[in-house]
């Protein structure tokens, strides 16, 4: 086992990364090894997908499968060995299918089929024992003694960034958004990473390419969500419990939420969002369901307590899931799509009757809590609509600075930095937030500036796209570069989606971003220095010191 993809990975003087019997996330060594083998098989599929494309062969089904299966290897997504093995076996079948199509096309064209690298040649074992025996060939740091640590760090930056992009591709696909060119670029990068490079410049360029690719993917996801559900609008949301039977929907998949709402109409069941599903409450399409009553709980790391206290059924539509046995709710939590936990019921297809039956059998909330509301829904359209008023307030001096504070949440004590930062921002500044990092301060009162709320909840982590659009619009109005705006970006990271959002911002030339609370363990000191010199990227320090720098206070 070797896994170093998330913030909570083991860090010791002897080396970084989870490499024992179990990772800090709860992932067993066997699961980690099977995930590495799955990635290896997917890279082999991409090798043939690239070659097939050169001869005009495009398989949309395979284009969708590869990022979806890759998504299953993200932090806190799938801990079920059987499901991971099934993905690997399907990858082997697709690779064989593409190989046959490619070789037939070569024969028809009268050309010789090209040799493929080792990553596209492995004959996958048929049992778990055989697959685990093959896993060392796919170990991410298998050549660590022969490769400089900076090269290893760049490889992992690319791999983990592409994982984040794969997740957004799958979210977009669920909403009907696919693009053959995007899929082609994805396969090219997967294929490249399947042949471990020692070219630092090429790896760095690839990291930026992943950022650019993800920008296109975020635009696709934005289109998918707004075409399906309308543009989010400022919305007041209750965050307390409501009497009645209950279902809690966590993750990121709004299509699943829509299906659950449709299937619970007239059933006497209240539906709550959780975590990154909170932004769904701002979409017009969901407002026609009166039994979508609010948001319950906070960010992913608190789920073992929050789900244990929730008196209904829980559905995990995507990341992040953690051990449901700790809170003794494994018999009433359900997984969807790429999510998996051993022993937890997995919902195939679009029939949520098992979830509904479980909710009806449980007690539900026995009384209404006194409501506590927050305002959400300041995504792209709402931000652009407010842009003229924002511009006028900037020109008048009422608004002097913008902060984007968001990203992933986590359970480290030093994440209180983001709470204190938000509370310490000047009263003449606006705070944009997104991702589950918002839960560090989204229930606090920040007031407004001439009717414009100081705290603007942009949405999910992928809605960084909305914030980027606002920054571009403001830069155009003020005839300046984005980096010349009075804008400070402070991103909390935990896993691979945050990594690819960061790569997206860097690829767009955005500078002076702060990340925290700790730097990724796979980034060496040399790489961190290069990123600081090239982009001004730096780690958070103290709220007082960082604010002085961001506000140019002597």
UniProtKB/Swiss-Prot annotation:
It is an enzyme of class 1 (oxidoreductase). HAMAP family: Hydroxylam_reduct. GO terms for molecular function: 2 iron, 2 sulfur cluster binding; hydroxylamine reductase activity; metal ion binding; peroxidase activity. The keyword Calcium does not apply. Binds 1 [2Fe-2S] cluster. Coiled coil: none annotated. Catalyzes the reduction of hydroxylamine to form NH(3) and H(2)O. Signal peptide: none annotated. Belongs to the HCP family. SUPFAM superfamilies: Prismane protein-like. This is Hydroxylamine reductase. [2Fe-2S] cluster binds at residues 3, 6, 18, 25.
